[in-house]
Amino acid sequence: ENIILVLTIDIALNRSCRQLEWRHLIVMKKVITYGTFDLLHWGHIHLLRRAKEMGDYLVVAISSDEFNKLKNKKSYHSFENRKMILEAIRYVDEVIPEHTWEQKVQDVQDHQIDVFVMGDDWEGKFDFLKEHCEVVYLPRTEGISTTQIKNDLLAVSK
């Protein structure tokens, strides 16, 4: 279900008491994507821009520090810092935490999501969401990844 904003405009015609009521419906298409978004780079920005182009409102769910520990992942930036960075990006309308793998169906329902977007390295992993929304896997940006950045930084420091 979409968010519907109803604007009402009253127009007085020829100084009479007659009024016309116009209703204009605006339906927002909502998109969601998930990730850690640590060491933000142009591949992330490219994903966020393409996701935003698929709708009017982009929700980004980022892995909480606790969830990263469960996945045996270590982030350089804390959840709060990653959230602050993402909120400053013009393509992003809302940032929410990702605490578990299982929360995606609930997020899609709670935020009335129309399109679920992930990189194609996750191809097929979220097809179960197709009964709730459209699922799109976008090609990854070639030549960049957070893992590559971390490895390059380690190599430079040696």
Name each model feature, range by range.
Residues I4, T8, A12-S16, E21-K158:
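Nucleotidyltransferase catalytic core that binds NTPs
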